[in-house]
Amino acid sequence: MHFSSCVLVSALAIVTNVATASPPPLHQLSRPALKDSTIFRSTVHCADCPEGNCYKCTLGHNNTLIANTGGMAYLRALVGFQLPVPAKKVKQCTVQFPAFVKLMEAPINITVSEAKSNDWDEDTVTGENAPDSGEPFSTSHVPALTNPPALDATEACKNAAENGDFSIYVGAQFGRFEIWSKDSGNPAILHTYYK
């Protein structure tokens, strides 16, 4: 009887270990943004834009990206990436921006939405020809006097083109922020977690 009890206890211990074992960890690869631009849409006069029309501004080589909601202007950052693995392997993606140009005095919510196309170029993209976007699929709350956290971009990653290209829009739910761009030497970084 004692031998049977030991075998039963050993078998239960093995089953318990198997049942509580952690799944294998995900692999991670990180890549910088390939392109970025502020997309400026406003009905006011913009002296630095062709014909004074804000929709015609090309801002793809500025050192910063701006997002603004409210007032007479609507600005969002458009950022393009390429997945380092096939989209079907992706479990999670985050995008990390380096820092705000100036820390925010008040909290702000940052939104991420998928651009419907990755067919744009920093030299020519404007408010008139920028790709359409979907509704925001993630929102991150940023407390006052802190930098942006890693932003969830999983939905856009999983919908990437066959070659891995995809773009996201980063915006402000209410308010305005400015972050460093690829042209400043501080590109956004895509962190891809995959199996």
UniProtKB/Swiss-Prot annotation:
GO cellular component, one term: extracellular region
UniProt superkingdom: Eukaryota
Location in or out of the cell: Secreted
Signal peptide as annotated in the record: 1-21
KW Signal (keyword) present: yes
Glycosylation sites: 62, 109
Name this polypeptide is given: Uncharacterized secreted protein ARB_00595
